[in-house]
Regions:
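Secretory targeting signals
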Residues: 24-77, 83, 154-227, 248-328, ...
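Membrane-proximal extracellular/periplasmic loop immediately following the first transmembrane helix
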Residues: 38-157, 475-551
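Juxtamembrane non-transmembrane "cap" segments at the membrane-aqueous interface
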Residues: 278-285, 355-374, 425-430
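Membrane-helix interface segments
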Residues: 16, 242-243, 332-337
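Alpha-helical transmembrane segments of multi-pass membrane transporters/translocases
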Residues: 17, 24-26, 31-32, 314-323, ...
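Helix-loop-helix units of permease transmembrane domains in multi-pass membrane transporters
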Residues: 3-12, 221-260, 442-446, 597-612
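Transmembrane helix segments
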Residues: 34-37, 333-366
């Protein structure tokens, strides 16, 4: 036991690994935040949270009514908005569309023009994506009893079809019958829907597994690689209990540390997603989560999270054993890291190449990469082809984990006890020629240290590529109001002149019939229904009034001599609207931290700061 605690102290006793783990956890949080930030195609986290609060005090049936009604309303408003948008562009054939959808216009047109609708997001299109997704999720879990009935019905129907009875291996018929038996005991499972975005994002974020792999490399570096490269491992192995017992202690320290790493990484995920999206009630059944509805265990979400952590720990330990073995057996550190990453990459290629329905699907799932796909293991049900008989996916993966874990553990202990494991000789490179020295300057030398020696050029290139990707994939929706506003502002852009004033006065003539009708309605000569014919013109008039009041009457009086410009694009470019400026500030701070973090530290470490 003393050896075990000694190995643990190597990991946690100093400041190196805890600090690096904190950096990895922060990187994981940053990537998670960047991956879930609101975009043109992705609603903000606050919207999921607000809808969850709205649904929390409703029954399952009431949730369905609310989501379907809200979806119908938003879909209708989006269609009406598209109608007005086409109208603003001078589209033709819209009269027939209005007649064909008269009921929709009667129900929602006034709501659209008055903007009395409530939104959980910033605009109707994002709102439509939100409720389209939530309605689909609800319909999936609400039909859980139908799904179970369908499994049983399909089993009874297909078992009588000759093509299944005459199958040479009998696999298809056995698979159908086994699936029906597994789901037969789940008919009394209660369903309580809640938006799954927060929960499923926290436990399925792909970058967390990559950061987990990076932490394995760090643990292997501390427990194995440093001691071998420094020659300390040879001394340790010469002591009593320095071989087999030490090897076992290192593996035990590795698996214990790995559990802490998992708890930190997924704790960060769950905490962030809980604060941003909300995870929902922990006591609802796991079948209430649409992505995990096919789970065959009768457990709650909280119990699933506990099993998820344990299963992920087991899969990570198996992959970590290979990382430890590769780090130990390689003569040089670089070869060890390449070997540690090569096998998982090869297994990922095998997994991607074999279809899930292939008769070789056992090979697809019996590898290290599949062991880390925990939701696939626990949250789904699948039978694999095993010499003509169906075998469950959990059975295949648990046997694989046990077999690989045993083989790799024995291999690590054997190599640790019997191999020489001497430190590699340092390479010396004698150049047949001498470099010519060139005059330099302080600025040039500091720039070289910053960009090349400190790696700032790599970070700058990565951030530049990320910025280009963001720019290429960015989307912006222009509604009818903005189309009309752009029409007016582009005509009067530039210095304010008599020509611009006269043009705006001419444009007012277009609204004369509508304004006269409004006066007659106010005097009681006409009913308010008479204004329905001017709905599209009212929207254009609101943009006209915006130009007059905000830009002419207010801005030009406050800033005499100023030029007018269509400013919407500039506001988006410089982050005056939305929250993109917050993201840009965080990214700029991160870039500065990465670029300048080692600039002074490397001089101070070598004592060069005193010389300089």
């Amino acid at each position: 036991m003393s050896l075990f605690f000694a190995e643990l102290r190597k990991v946690w006793g100093g400041r190196v690994f805890p600090a690096l783990l904190a950096i990895l956890a922060a990187a994981n949080l940053l990537l998670l935040w960047m991956g879930t930030r609101p975009t043109a195609k992705q609603p903000p986290a606050s919207a999921y949270r607000a809808v969850g609060v709205e649904l929390s005090d409703k029954t399952m049936e009431e949730k369905g009514v609310y989501l379907h009604n809200k979806y119908t309303e938003i879909e209708s408003l989006v269609k009406i908005g598209q109608y007005y948008r086409e109208l603003a562009y001078g589209g033709y054939g819209l009269t027939q569309y209005r007649q064909d959808n008269a009921a929709m216009f009667d129900a929602y047109e006034q709501e659209y023009t008055d903007k009395t609708y409530t939104l959980f997001t910033d605009n109707l299109n994002t709102e439509y994506r939100l409720f389209s997704q939530l309605q689909s999720e609800y319909d999936t879990v609400a039909a859980y009893s139908d799904f179970l009935d369908g499994v049983q019905t399909k089993a009874s129907q297909l078992s009588g079809i000759s093509i299944f009875q005459n199958d040479r291996t009998g696999y298809d018929l056995k698979n159908i019958e086994l699936t029906a038996q597994v789901y037969a005991g789940l008919t009394e499972t209660p369903i309580d829907y809640y938006p799954q975005k927060g929960l499923y994002t926290a436990i399925s974020y792909a970058f967390t597994d990559l950061i987990l792999l990076a932490s394995m490399l760090l643990l292997a570096l501390i427990l194995v690689r440093q001691e071998r490269d420094s020659g300390l491992l040879s001394l340790i192995r010469s002591l009593p209990g320095g071989r087999l017992k030490t090897a076992i202690a290192k593996l035990a320290a590795f698996v214990a540390s790995l559990l802490v790493v998992l708890m930190v990484l997924y704790g960060v995920n769950l905490a962030y997603c809980s604060a941003s999206f909300s995870l929902g009630p922990m006591n609802r059944t796991i079948q209430s989560v649409p992505a995990l509805m096919r789970c065959t265990m009768q457990i709650t979400v909280g119990q699933y999270l506990l099993r998820f952590l344990l299963a992920k720990w087991a899969g990570a330990f198996v992959m970590g054993l290979w990382v430890m073995l590769a780090a130990l057996i390689a003569k040089r550190a670089a070869a060890g890291w390449i070997g540690a990453l090569a096998l998982p990459l090869a297994m990922y290629g095998i997994r991607a190449a074999i279809p899930a329905t292939s008769h070789l699907n056992v090979i697809k799932y019996a590898n290290m990469v599949s062991l880390l796909q925990t939701n696939e293991l626990l949250g789904n049900y699948r039978n694999l082809f095993w010499f003509g008989s169906p075998i469950s996916l959990p059975m295949v993966e648990w046997v694989t984990a046990a077999a690989l874990g045993s083989v790799l553990s024995v291999a690590f202990c054997t190599v640790f006890t019997k191999a020489q494991l001497l430190p590699a000789a340092k390479r010396s490179l004698a150049l047949p020629f001498r470099h010519k020295t060139h005059a330099t300057s302080v600025t040039r030398e500091e720039g070289r240290k910053l960009l090349l020696m400190n790696g700032a050029a790599v970070f700058l290139a990565a951030f530049l590529a990320f910025g280009i990707y963001q720019g290429v994939t960015a989307e912006s929706y222009i509604d009818a109001d903005e189309i009309y506003y752009a029409y007016y502002m582009k005509h009067i852009s530039g210095p304010w002149s008599e020509r611009s004033r006269d043009w705006l006065k001419e444009q007012r003539n277009e609204f004369a019939p509508m304004l006269e009708a409004q006066k007659r309605v106010n005097r009681g000569e006409l009913s308010s229904e008479a204004l329905l014919a001017y709905n599209s013109l009212q929207q254009k008039y609101s943009a006209y009034q915006r130009v007059l009041q905000s830009n002419i009457s207010y801005y030009l009086k406050e800033n005499p001599g100023a030029w007018l410009v269509y400013e919407t694009g500039y506001k988006k470019l410089f982050g005056f609207t939305g929250t993109s400026d917050v993201q840009d500030t965080l990214l700029a701070g991160l870039l500065c931290a990465l670029c300048f973090s080692g600039l002074f530290a490397m001089e101070r470490k070598g004592g060069m700061d005193e010389i300089l």
